C-alpha cells in the first residue's frame, strides 16, 4: 500500500512539474481592462505546449491578444459562458509573438484567476497555423484569427491542409473568409478528401486578396450521417523543391564557372539537358 501511495505521489509530482505558472490572482477583464502578461513569462515556452487561462463569472467571449492584435494561432472570439477555462495550443508564430510581445487577455466581463502553460502536443509541424482540439458536430465553425497568416509568402505554398480525427470523408466542410457571396474558398466537392485531412489547393486562389478585407479564416463542418469528431490542425503545405534550376541560353556570365555533365565530365558547349554548375543541378 505504501509503495502504491509513493508511486501515485511521484506521478502527481511529474504532472505538476510539467506546468509553468505564468500568473495567478484576480483581474476583472473587460475590453477596456485587459490582463497583460509580459514576454519574459514565456521564455521557456515551446511549440505544442498548451496555454491554459482559468476564470470565473464568464458571461460572453474571450480573446487572446499580443501587441494589441489577435495572437497568431488563436480562435476568434471564443464563447465562454458557463465555462471555467480555455486551452490554447502554441504554434510557431504564436510562440514568436509571445516571446517578443507577451500576452493580453481580453473579453467581456469575466474574472481571470490563473494562467499557466504545460504539456500539450508533440511533433507540431513547423508550417502549422492552428493546432488544438475543436469538436465538429452539427454545423460547427472554427474561426481562426487572420494574424495567424501574417508574414506568409503564399507563393511558397500549394495547399492548406485541414486535419481531423474524422477517419472518413463523408462530412461537409466549407472553408470561408466571410459569410455570403465571395467568401467561400472551397468545400468537400472541390477539396481533396482523405480520412485524416481535407486539403484545399491554392491553385487559382489569391490568398493575399482573399484575406485582405477580413479578420478571420473560417472552417465550418457538419458531421452528416457519421459521428462527431475533433478537428486537430491547420497546416500550410509547401511546394516541392527539386533542386533543379534553369540555365539560360548563355549558360553563365561568370567565365570561371565550369559546367559538368551528370557523369562529372566538363562540358564546353552544353546542349539541352541536365548539368552540374557550382554544385547545383541546372536544367538547360
Feature-to-residue mapping (PLM):
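Sec-dependent N-terminal signal peptides
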Residues: 4-13
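Sec/Tat signal peptide C-region and signal peptidase I cleavage site
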Residues: 13-20
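Extracellular ligand-binding interfaces
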Residues: 20-97, 102, 106-238
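Residue-level detector of functionally pivotal "anchor" positions at catalytic/ligand-binding pockets or at interdomain
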Residues: 239-263
